């Protein structure tokens, strides 16, 4: 029997979220690493929106959302509070993260204003560090934010976030999650 297929891109925080769940549960997949400027035809056929991650199950079911992949492989049902945290991360924080990290993609954007706006989420996170599945759903985005200007990030008074992120990034599961694969060519 063939394995479910996971289309992924190593540096995408949504794909990291899905891969962390897959690694933690030992869920077996055929990993297909894609380059987003050269998306495979099969991936586009099963998921025309062209974003990663995409999980194709053996019965033909396609799961296109990272959180749904997490829920599927971990049999995880988010609590109301967890849903609120993920919602803030995926909407409010991600909105500002993109404009901070990629200001040239948007009209009339001050990346420092967006860094400050994104920082409000991190300040809240510093007061209530997520654990378990919720942690895996959020930390890839905080990693991306931190890595954009690591000196600035490290200079902020977010002791709990710094410790939590360091712990996430040094975990064996994260190291496995970040294994480098060659581009999958069909």
Predicted regions and their residues:
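Short alpha-helical "patches" and their helix-cap loops
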Residues: 31, 81, 112-116, 149-165
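Short, hydrophobic secondary-structure boundary micro-motifs
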Residues: 97, 154, 176-179
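GST superfamily/GST-like fold recognition
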Residues: 131-151, 157, 162
């Amino acid at each position: 029997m063939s394995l479910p297929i996971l289309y992924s891109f190593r540096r995408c925080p949504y794909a990291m979220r899905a891969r962390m769940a897959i690694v933690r549960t030992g869920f077996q997949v055929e990993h297909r690493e894609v380059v987003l400027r050269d998306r495979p035809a099969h991936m586009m056929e099963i998921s025309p929106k062209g974003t990663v991650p995409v999980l194709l199950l053996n019965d033909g079911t396609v799961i296109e959302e990272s959180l749904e992949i997490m829920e599927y492989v971990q049999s995880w049902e988010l609590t109301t509070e967890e849903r609120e945290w993920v919602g803030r991360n995926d909407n409010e924080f991600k909105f500002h993260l993109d404009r901070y990290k990629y200001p040239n993609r948007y009209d009339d954007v001050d990346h420092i204003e967006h860094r400050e706006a994104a920082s409000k989420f991190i300040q809240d996170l510093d007061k209530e560090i997520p654990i378990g599945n919720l942690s895996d759903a959020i930390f890839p985005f905080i990693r991306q934010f931190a890595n954009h200007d690591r000196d600035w990030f490290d200079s902020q008074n977010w002791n709990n976030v710094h410790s939590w992120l360091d712990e996430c990034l040094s975990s064996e599961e994260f190291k496995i999650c970040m294994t480098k694969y060659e581009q999958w060519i069909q």
